[in-house]
Regions:
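Short beta-alpha connecting loops at secondary-structure transitions
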Residues: 10-11, 174-181
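Histidine/acidic residue-rich metal-binding segments in metalloenzymes
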Residues: 56-76, 82-148, 152-174
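Glycine-rich beta-alpha junction loops
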Residues: 43-45, 152-153, 178-180
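Divalent-metal coordination cores built from histidine and acidic residues
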Residues: 2-103
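Short secondary-structure boundary segments
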Residues: 98-100, 179-182
Length: 182
């Protein structure tokens, strides 16, 4: 095979509309494909408490999905405020992922200082929201992995390329994050 052999997806958009039925659909639709499709479970459905969506997924709604062999962990924890301030629902989602020995991806643009320390100490493993080298280095020095993003809207490879020549190269990876297929 040539090209992409594996993708890791976060079905939060379909979950916002269809709830767990949407996640089930994604699993069924990707079964047996000639590409390995893995999943991170959506951490924020709806994305914010003010959003009106087709579903509200608490930690109980996603917990049973951790038993699926293609589930890698909890997708981009966008509610950094909830992590830092110990929101019970956010903490429950993190604890559930950890209980299943799964990774927790981050989403914390420009988080700094003690807030960043608390976010990472909660178990958030990686981040794909670094737009400059200083933000990436702050997270790397605290133990996070950095996903260097080249998506349709956000492109950070040029700004973060120096990381690929330094001592943190083994803690860096690439991601697309919302890439249009055209």
């Amino acid at each position: 095979p040539h090209g992409t052999t594996t993708v890791i997806t976060d079905p939060h958009e379909i979950a916002n509309v269809m709830g767990t039925d949407g996640i089930d659909y994604m699993f069924q639709a990707t079964e047996g494909l000639p590409i390995d499709v893995r999943f991170m479970l959506p951490s924020c459905v709806p994305a914010t408490p003010m959003d009106e969506s087709g579903a509200n997924l608490d930690y109980r709604a996603i917990d049973s999905f951790y038993d699926y062999p293609r589930v890698q962990g909890l997708a981009e924890m966008m509610n950094s405020y909830g992590v830092i301030h110990n929101d019970p629902e956010v903490v429950s989602k993190i604890v559930a992922a950890q209980a299943h020995h799964k990774k927790i991806d981050g989403h914390a643009p420009d988080l700094q200082g003690n807030d960043l320390n608390a976010y990472i100490a909660a178990g958030v493993y990686s981040d794909h929201e670094c737009s400059d080298i200083e933000d990436a280095l702050a997270k790397l020095r605290r133990g996070q992995f950095i996903m260097i993003r080249e998506g349709t809207a956000a492109r950070n490879l040029e700004a973060l390329a120096p990381l690929l020549c330094g001592k943190y190269i083994e803690r860096c990876m690439f991601c697309t994050d919302d890439k249009l297929s055209l």
